Amino acid sequence: NALVQTDTMTILMLFSNAGIILVTLLFCKLIQKRKVTTVGFQKPDMWKEYLTGMGIGFGIFTAAVLLCVITGSLKIQGMAPSFSIGIFVLFLLGYLVQGMAEEVLCRGYFLVSVSRRYPLAVGIIANAVLFAALHLLNNGITVLAFINLVLFGVFASVYFVKRGNIWGVGALHSIWNLAQGNVYGIRVSGIQTSCSVLSSEMVAGRELINGGDFGLEGGLAVTIVLVVGTLVLLATRQRRYVED
């Protein structure tokens, strides 16, 4: 079955991101002489931050889904017949690794490193562009999709700085991806999976809103939730700084 083979490859790819975490942490420790805490692995309230991040990640993506449904850009057709709890759990664990890996690389390493030498705003923009560039070879990438990926990078950076740890933003990123592909059955940055809780259909002619072949990350619904989310974060009190 081609779809099963595709899911197997996707799951293996997700777990392979553990290598990014390991290499990044080793580079920070051995080359930059940084403590692990400077990457954002702070102990205080670790589980609370992680669970909060999971909830926010699911919530903001669901907000984008609702925008698409309200505007007639997405139809949720009900429970997906191909759902498998075993495959779903593997995707969940895989995305927990993948989401954290991208956050460790882009926020924990790159943002902190750049911000030590330049203003924080420079670090935020630079790592957001790097994050978006990592997805340039994905299927269905468009100019709006790239802009949204930059916006996600900015949103994640502000969340990281405001919360002062990597746990929350890593969880947020992971569940954002899981919600797309394996809850709502929508392409994750152009990647399609066969195992999802719900079956959804992109409405033709509404690609500007729903993102078309790239998934919701390529449409204006995600643009709106990320801009609003970032503005809300900027208005909140900063919890603590990541340790220098």
Give, region by region, the residue ranges found by the protein language model.
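N-terminal, membrane-interfacial amphipathic/helix-forming hydrophobic leader that caps
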Residues: 1-35, 181-244
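Functionally important transmembrane alpha-helices
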Residues: 145-208
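Membrane-helix interface segments
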Residues: 45-47, 84-85, 117-122, 142, ...
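Small-polar-interrupted transmembrane alpha-helices in polytopic inner-membrane proteins
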Residues: 95, 119-136, 149-153
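Hydrophobic alpha-helical transmembrane segments
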Residues: 11-15, 50-55, 88-89, 121-126, ...
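Membrane-interface helix caps and helix-loop-helix hairpins in membrane proteins
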Residues: 73-81, 134-143
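Juxtamembrane helix-loop-helix connectors linking adjacent transmembrane helices
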Residues: 1-13, 35-104, 111-116
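Membrane-interface helix/loop boundary segments of multi-pass membrane proteins
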Residues: 101-126, 158-165
